[in-house]
C-alpha cells in the first residue's frame, strides 16, 4: 500500500520544525544572520554540505557553519534554504545573480540551471493564479479527509478480522461466516483492480479521449484512483495507480501526468523516488512541490460529476517527455543589470576547448573561468552510485537529452531506481555536467595510491609501501576501493590529515589480488618527501574493507592496472560472476603523451574514456583539466585567485570577479588579468 502524500507531509513537518527551531542540529551563519536547519536535509540537497558533515561527523564544533558572506549573501541563502525544504524558489531580477553564485558555491545544480535559463531567456514558468492556489488548497484538504476515511476503514477491517480470529468456530458454518467476515476488504480490492484493468483495455480501443472528462488535479494532493462514488470511500483511494509501462503506448491516453507551463533542463534533475518498489524501468519522475499525479479514469456517464474534481489537464503527455517545475517569479522589470557579455559568460559551459552554443549565442571557451557555476560543473550530482540498505540497489540517473526533459528543483528526492546501468553510462558524454560516478558517504570510492615501483620485479610487490600518494610517477597504477567484498580488515592508525599516506600490503592468489589498506601518518606535509602545499581537505571516509579485481593484471607489476570492483560480487575462474559499475583504467601511452600538462598536476590522474581526467582523491572524472583542477580545490581548500588590491583569496575566479565588482572599493578593471575581464 502506497501513501501518496507521505513525502509532502514529511517535508512540511521538517519545514515547520526549521521555522520554529525544533530539533535543528546545525546553524548556518551568513553575515549577521543565523539559519537553523537539519543536517540531513542540507546534506541531501547539497553535496557541499554533505562533504562538510561527512568529514566532521561527531565533531560538535561543526554545529555552527559560517559561509563567506561575499560569495553567499544572506538573502540568497534564505531563498535557497526555503527551496530545500519547500521546492519553491523565489527568483527575480534583483536576486538572480546572487542566487546563482550562492547555488554554484553550494553545488545546487538544479538552481544553477534555473538561473542560467532565466538569464538566457528572461522567462520562467509563471506561478498559478491565486484562485487556482485556493482551489488546490481545498482539494488538498478534501484528499486528506479521504485518506483519513480510508485509514479508518482499514483499521475497522483489521479489528473485525482480529475479532473473527478470537471467536471459537467449532462448526463449519461458523468458520465460513468468520472467513466471510475477514475477507470482504481484500476481495473488494481484487474485484476493483480487475474491473479497472478491463476498463483500461476498453479505452485502448478508442482513438482519443474526451477532454471534457479530464481537468486539472491539484499538485499538492496525493494520487487517487477514482471510478465511482463508492470508491471515494474505499481504501483503494490510498493506492497509487499502476506505473506507466514502457511498451504501453496507448496508456498515455488514460494514465496522464500533470505538467506545468514550461519545461527546460535535463532529465537528470527531474528525479524523485518511486513510491512503489515494483517499478524498475521507465518511470514518471515527479516534482516534490508539484506532486504530479497519475489519474486512472473511467468514462461511464453516471460517474462524470465525481470525476470532474479529480481530473487531469494534459491527457496525452508521453512518458519521458517534458516535465516541469514550479518557480514563483517576482513582478519586476526585465531590464538586465549586466551587459550581454557577462550574461553569456554565466550561461556558457565549455566541454574541452570547443565552443558552445547557448540559446543562439556562441560562446568561446576562454570565458568559462568566469562562470559562477564553475563549481556546479566540477561537483555535480552523481551519475551513478550504489545504495546499500540490506541489499544493493543501482540508482540510475537518466541523461536522455533527446527528450529535452525537464527540470525539477526538488533535488532532495532524486532516487529513481533503474536496472540498466550500461545505458546510463552510454549517455555520460552527452550531458553538460562534466563529472560522474562519485559518492561522498562512507562507501564513496576514491583513488588510493598504487604500490611503489618495486626493484625486484613482480616478486617484490608484497609488503611494498608508497612514499607519497600525491607525487607518484605518471605511469603509476590506481585502485578504487569499495566495501565489504572479501571481508579484509582495514586498520585506521591515524585521523584524516592533509598529507596522510595509504600503505598497501598485497598478497597474490590464484583468483585475485587482495589488499589490506592501512593509513600511515607521515611527517609535516610542508617538508620532506611531500612537495605540495598543505591545504584543508574535504574528502570522504575510508571504506572499512576492500577488494581488488585482478582479472586484467599482467605479470609485470610496474605496468599493472589495479581496478576496484564497484559492486559486491564473487570471482569464478578469474572472471566476475556478476557485473559491477565500470572501473577506471590507466590511460594508454598515446593518451599520456598528449596530456603532459595533466601529469604535472597534483591529484590529477589520466584515465581511459571520454572523461580522461580523474580526481585522485574521490575518483571523479572530467572532460577538461580545468574542471578537474577546480574540483580538487574542494578537497584541498586551495584559493589560487587573489584580489590585487585587498589581498583576499578565492577558490573560484567567479568569486573573485564578484568581489572585485561589488565589495572591493579599490578595484580597477585595468589591474585585473585579461582572463578575468
Swiss-Prot record:
A zinc finger (C2H2-type) spans 613-635, 641-664. Gene3D superfamilies: Classic Zinc Finger (3.30.160.60), Potassium Channel Kv1.1, Chain A (3.30.710.10). PANTHER family: AGAP004733-PA, ZINC FINGER PROTEIN 37-LIKE. Residues 158-181, 287-300, 552-576 have a biased composition (Polar residues). This is Zinc finger and BTB domain-containing protein 5. May be involved in transcriptional regulation. The gene is ZBTB5. It comes from the Eukaryota.
Amino acid at each position: 500500500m502506497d501513501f501518496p502524500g507521505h513525502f509532502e507531509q514529511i517535508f512540511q513537518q521538517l519545514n515547520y520544525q526549521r521555522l520554529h527551531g525544533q530539533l535543528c542540529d546545525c546553524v548556518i551563519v551568513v553575515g549577521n544572520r543565523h539559519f537553523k536547519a537539519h543536517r540531513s536535509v542540507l546534506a541531501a540537497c547539497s553535496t557541499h554540505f554533505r562533504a562538510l558533515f561527512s568529514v566532521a561527523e561527531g565533531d560538535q564544533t561543526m554545529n555552527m557553519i559560517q559561509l563567506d558572506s561575499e560569495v553567499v549573501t544572506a538573502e540568497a541563502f534564505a531563498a535557497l534554504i526555503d527551496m530545500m525544504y519547500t521546492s519553491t524558489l523565489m527568483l527575480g531580477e534583483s536576486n538572480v545573480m546572487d542566487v546563482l553564485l550562492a547555488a554554484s558555491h553550494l553545488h545546487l545544480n538544479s538552481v544553477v540551471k534555473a538561473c542560467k535559463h532565466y538569464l538566457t531567456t528572461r522567462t520562467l514558468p509563471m506561478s498559478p493564479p491565486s484562485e487556482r492556489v485556493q482551489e488546490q488548497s481545498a482539494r488538498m484538504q478534501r484528499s486528506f479527509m479521504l485518506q483519513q476515511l480510508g485509514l479508518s476503514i482499514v483499521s475497522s477491517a483489521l479489528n473485525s478480522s482480529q475479532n473473527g480470529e478470537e471467536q471459537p468456530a467449532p462448526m463449519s458454518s461458523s468458520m465460513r461466516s468468520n472467513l466471510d467476515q475477514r475477507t470482504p476488504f481484500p476481495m473488494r480490492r481484487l474485484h476493483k483492480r480487475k474491473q479497472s484493468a478491463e476498463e483500461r483495455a476498453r479505452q485502448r480501443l478508442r482513438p482519443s479521449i474526451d477532454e471534457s472528462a479530464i481537468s486539472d488535479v491539484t499538485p499538492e494532493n496525493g494520487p487517487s484512483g477514482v471510478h465511482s462514488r463508492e470508491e471515494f470511500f474505499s481504501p483503494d483511494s490510498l493506492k497509487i495507480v499502476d506505473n506507466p509501462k514502457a511498451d504501453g503506448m496507448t496508456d498515455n491516453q488514460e494514465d496522464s501526468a500533470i505538467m506545468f507551463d514550461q519545461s527546460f533542463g535535463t532529465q537528470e534533475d527531474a528525479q524523485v523516488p518511486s513510491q512503489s518498489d515494483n517499478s524498475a524501468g521507465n518511470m514518471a519522475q515527479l516534482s516534490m512541490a508539484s506532486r504530479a499525479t497519475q489519474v486512472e479514469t473511467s468514462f461511464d456517464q453516471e460517474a462524470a460529476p465525481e470525476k470532474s474534481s479529480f481530473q487531469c489537464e494534459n491527457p496525452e503527455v508521453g512518458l519521458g517527455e517534458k516535465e516541469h517545475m514550479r518557480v514563483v517569479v517576482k513582478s519586476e522589470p526585465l531590464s538586465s543589470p549586466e551587459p550581454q557579455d557577462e550574461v553569456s559568460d554565466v550561461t556558457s559551459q565549455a566541454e574541452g576547448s570547443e565552443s558552445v552554443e547557448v540559446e543562439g549565442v556562441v560562446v568561446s571557451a576562454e570565458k568559462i573561468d568566469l562562470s559562477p557555476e564553475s563549481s556546479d560543473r566540477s561537483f555535480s550530482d552523481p551519475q551513478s552510485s550504489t545504495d546499500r540498505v540490506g541489499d544493493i540497489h543501482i540508482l540510475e540517473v537518466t541523461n536522455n537529452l533527446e527528450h529535452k526533459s525537464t527540470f525539477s528543483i526538488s533535488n532532495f528526492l532524486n532516487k529513481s531506481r533503474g536496472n540498466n546501468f550500461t545505458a546510463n553510462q552510454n549517455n555520460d558524454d552527452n550531458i553538460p555536467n562534466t563529472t560522474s560516478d562519485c559518492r561522498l558517504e562512507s562507501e564513496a570510492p576514491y583513488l588510493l595510491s598504487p604500490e611503489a615501483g618495486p626493484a625486484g620485479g613482480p616478486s617484490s610487490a608484497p609488503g611494498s609501501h608508497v612514499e607519497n600518494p600525491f607525487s607518484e610517477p605518471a605511469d603509476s597504477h590506481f585502485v578504487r576501493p569499495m566495501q565489504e567484498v572479501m571481508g579484509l580488515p582495514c586498520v585506521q592508525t591515524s585521523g584524516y590529515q592533509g598529507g596522510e599516506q595509504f600503505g598497501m600490503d598485497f598478497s597474490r592468489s590464484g583468483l585475485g589480488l587482495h589488499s589490506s589498506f592501512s593509513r600511515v601518518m607521515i611527517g609535516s606535509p610542508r617538508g620532506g618527501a611531500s612537495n605540495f602545499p598543505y591545504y584543508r581537505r574535504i574528502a570522504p571516509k575510508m571504506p572499512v574493507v576492500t577488494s581488488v579485481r585482478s582479472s586484467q593484471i599482467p605479470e609485470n607489476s610496474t605496468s599493472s592496472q589495479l581496478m576496484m570492483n564497484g559492486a559486491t560480487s564473487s570471482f569464478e575462474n578469474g572472471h566476475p560472476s556478476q557485473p559491477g559499475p565500470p572501473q577506471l583504467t590507466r590511460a594508454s601511452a598515446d593518451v599520456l603523451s598528449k596530456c603532459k600538462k595533466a601529469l604535472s598536476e597534483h591529484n590529477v590522474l589520466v584515465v581511459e574514456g571520454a572523461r580522461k581526467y580523474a580526481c585522485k582523491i574521490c575518483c571523479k572524472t572530467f572532460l577538461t583539466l580545468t574542471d578537474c583542477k577546480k574540483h580538487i580545490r574542494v578537497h584541498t581548500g586551495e584559493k589560487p585567485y587573489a584580489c590585487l588590491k585587498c589581498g583576499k583569496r578565492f577558490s573560484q575566479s567567479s568569486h573573485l570577479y564578484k568581489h572585485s565588482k561589488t565589495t572591493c572599493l579599490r578595484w580597477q578593471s585595468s589591474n585585473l588579468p585579461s582572463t578575468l575581464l
